[in-house]
Amino acid sequence: MLKIGKVESYIHEKLKEEKLHFVLLDPEDVSPRLASKLAKISEEVGVDAIMVGGSTGAEGEVLDGVVKAIKENSSLPVILFPGSHGGLSKYADAVFFMSLLNSRNPFFIAGAQALGAFRVKHYGIEPIPMAYLVVEPGETAGWVSDANLIPRHKPKIAAAYALAGQYMGMRLVYLEAGSGAPEHIPNEMIKVVKSAIDVPLIVGGGIRTYEDAKEVVQSGADIIVTGTAIEKAGSLEESKKRLESIINGVKEVSP
């Protein structure tokens, strides 16, 4: 049986007290220097973990450089969010070992995972099994992964996939609208999915403001993820301001 590791235990323990906010940094969009600064700011304002990865699949020295820069400037867990089997770094703490359940391409359901499995084991990275579902509009993530996008007005389809993922042993479910999406996952879909599953629910894509974050958490998200809104804020000061606002929206709803 796959044991629950240090990072996953950290997530579950924190969820007993509050809802969580993760920042996603894409090595193709941020340099190691910028990543280190964003990581430091993230920890200062109360972010709970930093995810590293992207749909177009940064890997090798580019990925390692960003992960190491984050680790050197923050004590937050670094969780890989790979676009494919190449998105692995031995310097990370954990990896969301995810299956994109609504992809038309079996490579993204189990192929990439098979190609990366022994590297995860060899590197000693903690794997966290996760069901990944891409909802309209999907943005780059949907296009690259050939996702059969879940319609925004069909929450039961999302719930069916989410529950299937749970029954297949996934310990997290992630609803993805796509980085830079004009809107976040519909509140009704979040509610329906959350009511169907017993594992933590992550929601990402299109979350830019205090109001967005509060709505998403009130609807049932346990963890929200923001990336584009932080990476492309224009300045470190604006990134910090946006992070503080979003975190306030998350923590205000926490039990």
From Swiss-Prot:
Binding site for sn-glycerol 1-phosphate: 174-180, 205-206, 227-228
Xref: InterPro entries: GGGP/HepGP_synthase_sf (IPR038597), GGGP_HepGP_synthase (IPR008205), GGGP_synth (IPR010946), IGPS_HisA/HisF (IPR050064)
Required co-factors: Mg(2+)
Listed pathway(s): Membrane lipid metabolism; glycerophospholipid metabolism
Record-listed E.C. numbers: 2.5.1.41
Catalytically driven reaction(s): sn-glycerol 1-phosphate + (2E,6E,10E)-geranylgeranyl diphosphate = sn-3-O-(geranylgeranyl)glycerol 1-phosphate + diphosphate
Pfam families, A to Z: PcrB
GO molecular function, one term: phosphoglycerol geranylgeranyltransferase activity
Assigned keywords, A-Z: Cytoplasm, Lipid biosynthesis, Lipid metabolism, Magnesium, Metal-binding, Phospholipid biosynthesis, Phospholipid metabolism, Transferase
Database matches in SUPFAM superfamilies: FMN-linked oxidoreductases
Swiss-Prot/TrEMBL GO biological process terms: glycerophospholipid biosynthetic process
Compartments it resides in: Cytoplasm
Binding site for Mg(2+): 26, 55
GO cellular component, one term: cytoplasm
Residue ranges the record marks as coiled coil: none
The family this protein is said to belong to: Belongs to the GGGP/HepGP synthase family. Group II subfamily.
Function summary: Prenyltransferase that catalyzes the transfer of the geranylgeranyl moiety of geranylgeranyl diphosphate (GGPP) to the C3 hydroxyl of sn-glycerol-1-phosphate (G1P). This reaction is the first ether-bond-formation step in the biosynthesis of archaeal membrane lipids.
HAMAP family: GGGP_HepGP_synthase
Protein name: Geranylgeranylglyceryl phosphate synthase
